[in-house]
Amino acid sequence: MKPFGLSPLDIDAIFLTHEHTDHCRALKSFNKGRARVFANRLTAESVMCAEPETKRLEWSIFENGSEFGFSGLSVSPFSTPHDSSDSVGYCFCAGGKRLVWMTDLGKVTFLARDFAQRANILVLESNYCPRMLENSPRPYSLKSRIKGSHGHLSNADAVALLKTMDSSVSEKIYLAHISRECNSVPHIRELLSGVGEILPKIEIVSPFSESSTPYDDGEA
């Protein structure tokens, strides 16, 4: 947030996908702000149990598969397979356009594929290169979790989905949630050549940049 000149006071809403630390560790920084935090019940309960300070936030609880509105947006959360309490992706609609956020899923379900294929803008996980993961010093249990059906999408998994996309519908695709240790931009590009007409619309969100670090206001 800091590289963009933003603070918690500037944020109106936070949409949680799940409770893992890399997604919500800075949430308590918003205690002094006005942001509403949207999450399903299991995710909210898990976060508040791990970080009691977050109980002071303004929580808005939804059910997966339900549609709700916020500030001119139509928001549809959908279930995703991940090793968390109740992980979701999001579809945000406004002005006839759809933005779909889809990270942290071990496989592309029929539901996730449907949302992705109807997205004008898609944020899609391309988390790891299998070869780099296998050669990494990570323990076997972690490698198995990442590769599992409730882990993360590999580069090949992401590309397989991209090959099903309609270039007349997709306007922009961001490949994100890229592992710093077990992936690289060249490894992703190596596979992208086979995606067809949609290739010029794809942007890789590199993790090797200070701008991707989470907001931290310096308070304990």
Predicted regions and their residues:
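Short, basic/aromatic-enriched C-terminal tail that caps enzymatic domains
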Residues: 198-220
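Metal-dependent catalytic neighborhoods of phosphoester/phosphodiester hydrolases
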Residues: 25-34, 48-50, 183-190
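Cap/insert and terminal regions of metallo-dependent hydrolase folds
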Residues: 110-206
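Active-site environment of divalent metal-dependent phosphoester hydrolases
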Residues: 20-24, 45-46, 84-85, 108-110, ...
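Active-site neighborhood of divalent metal-dependent phosphoester bond hydrolases
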Residues: 43-61
